[in-house]
């Protein structure tokens, strides 16, 4: 009887682990699909009034928040308010590229492609928040 109880408990633990593992794998798959599907729209900088605008992007495993300062139709500054990532800190260099090229869809940082995309989308969302709906 004791062996059956131990066996049943082990099977229960294994079943729970299998369910949790499957849920985690589904989350990872969903995250990867979301990032891969990201597209970028270039906002018309000349139409954006001077000011500082905030934007965020959250794709579960990576989250970013930025404050974008626009002056005279140019991106003058991007402040990183938040960047939750696992190994994507090098992607933060993409913010300087956006300022230098004055466009959102710059090349991603090698080895930090997903974080680069999330940061670019946060900047785009900040700039789009200025457009009347």
Region annotations inferred by a language model:
Residues 1-65, 69-133:
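Intrinsically disordered terminal and processing segments
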């Amino acid at each position: 009887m004791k062996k059956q109880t131990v066996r049943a408990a082990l099977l229960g633990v294994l079943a729970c682990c299998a369910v949790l593992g499957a849920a985690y794998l589904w989350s990872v798959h969903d995250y990867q699909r979301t990032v891969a599907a990201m597209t970028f729209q270039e906002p018309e900088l000349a139409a954006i009034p001077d000011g500082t605008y905030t934007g965020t992007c959250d794709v579960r495993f990576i989250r970013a928040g930025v404050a974008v300062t626009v002056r005279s139709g140019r991106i003058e500054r991007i402040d990183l308010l938040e960047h939750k990532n696992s190994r994507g800190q090098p992607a933060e260099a993409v913010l300087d590229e956006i300022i230098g090229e004055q466009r959102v869809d710059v090349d991603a940082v090698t080895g930090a492609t997903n974080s680069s995309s999330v940061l670019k989308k946060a900047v785009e969302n900040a700039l789009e928040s200025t457009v009347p709906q």
